[in-house]
Amino acid sequence: GKVNYETYSYFKSLFFSTLYAEEFKYKVIGKLKTDNVIDFPEGGKFVSFHHEGGFETDIGKYGEYQCRGSILYDKNEKLVNMFFACENFDQNGQKFINMGKRFKGSDIDRAVGNMSIIEGEGFWKDYIGYRCTYAVEYVNKVIFAPAQCKNSF
């Protein structure tokens, strides 16, 4: 009857919430390794970047990461497009890939973006499809990027 179903749903939600979190925090601290630039005659530029470092989460996982991507700026230094992929290895050697992009915006928009976990091994299989909103701060060549990730289903 009804009671059994409600009890079942309750335990099911309890069980699944211990398996994986509906949302989690993910933070990287990294260093810019390469930053290759093509300057356009009229002032725009195309930047190819690579940074690497460490990440930590509030779901008990931490490890190392590297990201590669490209950014296109217009002649007023406004972001036109950005596209990147990151490879993450946690403390158990399990890997997940996140990809993101940012579109046209002001200088301020430049520091905020979205990414998604598109592939994962082991533990991370349950997090495929999660969307993360991140903010980026630079101190010289060091990158700080806290993110909030949510189940998008």
Question: Each predicted region: which residue ranges?
Answer:
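Extreme N-termini of proteins with methionine-enriched Sec-type signal peptides or N-terminal signal-anchor
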Residues: 4-5
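Bacterial N-terminal signal peptides
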Residues: 9-14
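N-terminal signal peptide c-region/cleavage motif recognized by signal peptidases
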Residues: 16-18
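Beta-strand-enriched cores of mature, soluble protein domains
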Residues: 20-153
